[in-house]
Amino acid sequence: MFCPLKLILLPVLLDYSLGLNDLNVSPPELTVHVGDSALMGCVFQSTEDKCIFKIDWTLSPGEHAKDEYVLYYYSNLSVPIGRFQNRVHLMGDILCNDGSLLLQDVQEADQGTYICEIRLKGESQVFKKAVVLHVLPEEPKELMVHVGGLIQMGCVFQSTEVKHVTKVEWIFSGRRAKEEIVFRYYHKLRMSVEYSQSWGHFQNRVNLVGDIFRNDGSIMLQGVRESDGGNYTCSIHLGNLVFKKTIVLHVSPEEPRTLVTPAALRPLVLGGNQLVIIVGIVCATILLLPVLILIVKKTCGNKSSVNSTVLVKNTKKTNPEIKEKPCHFERCEGEKHIYSPIIVREVIEEEEPSEKSEATYMTMHPVWPSLRSDRNNSLEKKSGGGMPKTQQAF
């Protein structure tokens, strides 16, 4: 008589003991971003068909903070409390002893340890389970991409319970376009389904990059066009539970400023026409370079000769008293040299005003031998004045 009773009580006591010891074992952890949702499981396994009488969810922020109520369930009534109103819901099946909690629009202050307590009707024992929630900064809801580039749009639903994703759907809505299905995944087909072009212009440009078994429905959009700018809404279905997330995509027509990467440092391969043009330019430059040098030299020589001629003419005009005076020194046979003074303008320095005399230079002009006798006769006549010939000649 007592054996069946022992067999019934033993699993129940084991279940209660496991539930109480869940706090001693390291609890599961969830990491979510600000603004996302988190599903914290609290499932009580029991062999008896007893209904849940009460469920309490509390938050323990830390050592120096007080615990606060999140939600409580009593007599088929679920009541969120305090700052968690409109953000928490019981998503489990109460009839199946499932008191899982869905926390939406997660805030930084929501970080901490969440404790679930389940009481069955007519039982004094309490089943407890803890979940540690870590909160990260908010992910950008607006993304920027350039035309022709690629962009990854994330969509992850964090949950402690292992639930199969039944459906993943991405819907696009632009400013000038109606809603259009971008990507759809069915769990029954066990394959991703991309719509043909008749369904939209995303065909062959969207790939699933997330892990469906981890509730990750992220996609990659390639070959971005200007018309791709708009809102992208992701929906992850876990049975009756639906998680949604919206991303705004901005498309810029400008080319991105590429960073210096090893791929960018690869040598550029020139085409046939470009190579011919470059070789032609180099050859023409080499051939024309000597001609340009000769032209420059000739131009400089002409300018110098013209300048010297103008200088001599200007000197004669400014000093008309300058005449050729004979000099009677014979330096070679058959010709004489006549020295005439050339007066050069005085150079005045700004720092030291000088009173230097004008410099005098002598120029030699050849005299033909036929004029030698006439010159000698004139010298003999002048020497009759009583001065020595050498001095007069000098």
UniProtKB/Swiss-Prot annotation:
What's the effect of swapping K54E? Loss of the ability to homodimerize, loss of interaction with CXADR and loss of function in cell-cell adhesion
- Sites carrying a glycan are N76, N231
What's the superkingdom here? Eukaryota
Compartments in which it is found? Cell membrane; Cell junction
- Identify the Gene3D superfamilies for this entry: Immunoglobulins
Q: Which Pfam families match?
A: V-set
Q: What is this protein called?
A: Junctional adhesion molecule-like
